């Protein structure tokens, strides 16, 4: 994310999203009734062309709309914001509806009552764009699962079988193994950034040696760590361990996973935790909240009612973490009601 300009007297921030992660952040920053300004395509009636008067022609115009619907489309790499037009050229009626498709590298101006957590989220998105992307390969000698670590969750890129078998002789197994390594490398070679190989056994070390010999330009990006499990269980183990943070410089998804894990640990021992809106509000009455955790879904559905609570947490110097429901930790928090808190001291 690039923050181009801040205009505090008008509550406007001009910015440029640079990738899918930035669009996801924006989908949680832009709320109904916010004003969005951008260059967009609009079909307008061409009164001088009778043949096309029924459809009009598309042209690029600078419009402002008051947001009503905000939809993040991961598969199409865009964020769609729909609402009534509040600023337009003279030939486009104010109050008519329009949808602005926000895509990477489109400059957008957002006008809203900016909260502290909105600004923090923008700054976080700006910082994350400077960090290397991380691909995680959870593997052993028989299978590899490949994942891309994003700000809002994990994307599974591929699942590859080795073809190694006890039924094959040594030479055939060696051929199958090298073919397996080649398939893995072909699946990750287009991604810039760090590549973490993890899993039980020696598969991770063997492929590191193979890359050092055959793909020397890729070798400096390779990191190897042990894990007790394969597949998604192995990925969960890696996220909880903090290894991603060492590579990435604190990945959002790793941070969220670790804080939810801490919450579950406190709940299991009836320690410094509260979950559910009633329990959390009660903790706030005692100024006991150290860290407030909300899922993005909960905040979206209850923003107006929960903003007072968030402001109160900030007033006692508490932390606020908004957790994505696109990964397992977010789903666990959702199962607890979507809102929880880590406490400074126990309360009755």
Swiss-Prot record:
Keywords: Cytoplasm, Endonuclease, Hydrolase, Metal-binding, Nuclease. GO terms for biological process: nonfunctional rRNA decay; nuclear-transcribed mRNA catabolic process, no-go decay; nuclear-transcribed mRNA catabolic process, non-stop decay; ribosome disassembly; RNA surveillance. InterPro entries: eFR1_2_sf, eRF1_1_Pelota, eRF1_3, Pelota/DOM34_N, Pelota_arc, Ribosomal_eL30-like_sf, Transl-rel_pelota. Its cofactor is a divalent metal cation. It is found in: Cytoplasm. SUPFAM superfamilies: Dom34/Pelota N-terminal domain-like (SSF159065), L30e-like (SSF55315), Translational machinery components (SSF53137). Gene3D superfamilies: 3.30.1330.30, eRF1 domain 2, Pelota, domain A. Pfam families: eRF1_1, eRF1_3. Its EC number is 3.1.-.-. GO terms for cellular component: cytoplasm. GO terms for molecular function: endonuclease activity; metal ion binding. It comes from the Archaea. Its main location: cytoplasm. The N-terminal domain has the RNA-binding Sm fold. It harbors the endoribonuclease activity. NCBIfam families: pelota. Monomer. May function in recognizing stalled ribosomes, interact with stem-loop structures in stalled mRNA molecules, and effect endonucleolytic cleavage of the mRNA. May play a role in the release non-functional ribosomes and degradation of damaged mRNAs. Has endoribonuclease activity. Belongs to the eukaryotic release factor 1 family. Pelota subfamily. This is Protein pelota homolog. The lineage of its organism: Archaea, Methanobacteriati, Methanobacteriota, Methanomada group, Methanococci.
């Amino acid at each position: 994310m690039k923050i181009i300009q801040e205009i505090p007297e008008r509550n406007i921030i001009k910015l440029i999203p640079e990738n899918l992660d930035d669009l996801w952040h924006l989908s949680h920053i832009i709320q109904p009734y916010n004003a969005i300004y951008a260059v967009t395509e609009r079909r307008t009636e061409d009164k001088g062309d009778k043949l096309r008067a029924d459809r009009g022609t598309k042209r690029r115009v600078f419009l402002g709309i008051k947001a009503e619907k905000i939809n993040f489309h991961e598969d199409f790499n865009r964020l769609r914001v729909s609402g009534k037009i509040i600023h337009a050229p003279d030939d486009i009626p104010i109050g008519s509806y329009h949808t602005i498709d926000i895509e990477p590298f489109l400059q957008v101006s957002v006008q809203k009552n900016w909260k502290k957590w909105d600004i923090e989220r923008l700054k976080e998105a700006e910082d994350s764009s400077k960090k290397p992307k991380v691909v995680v390969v959870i593997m052993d000698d028989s299978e590899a699962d490949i994942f891309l670590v994003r700000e809002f969750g994990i994307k599974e890129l591929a699942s590859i079988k080795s073809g190694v078998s006890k039924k094959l002789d040594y030479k055939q197994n060696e051929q199958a193994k090298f073919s397996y390594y080649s398939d893995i490398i072909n699946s990750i070679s287009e991604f810039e950034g760090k590549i973490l190989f993890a899993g039980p056994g020696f598969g991770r070390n063997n492929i590191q040696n193979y890359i050092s010999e055959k793909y020397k330009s890729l070798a400096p990006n390779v990191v190897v760590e042990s894990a007790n499990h394969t597949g998604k269980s192995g990925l969960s183990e890696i996220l909880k361990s903090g290894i991603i943070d060492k590579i990435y410089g604190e990945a959002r998804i790793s941070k969220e996973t670790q804080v939810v894990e801490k919450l579950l640990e406190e709940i299991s021992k009836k320690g410094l935790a509260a979950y559910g809106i009633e329990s959390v509000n009660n903790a706030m009455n005692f100024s006991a909240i150290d860290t407030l955790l909300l899922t993005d879904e909960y905040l979206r559905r209850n923003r107006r009612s929960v903003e007072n609570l968030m402001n109160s947490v900030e007033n006692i110097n508490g932390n606020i973490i908004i957790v994505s429901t696109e990964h397992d930790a977010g789903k666990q928090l959702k199962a607890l009601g979507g809102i929880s808190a880590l406490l400074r001291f126990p309360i009755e």
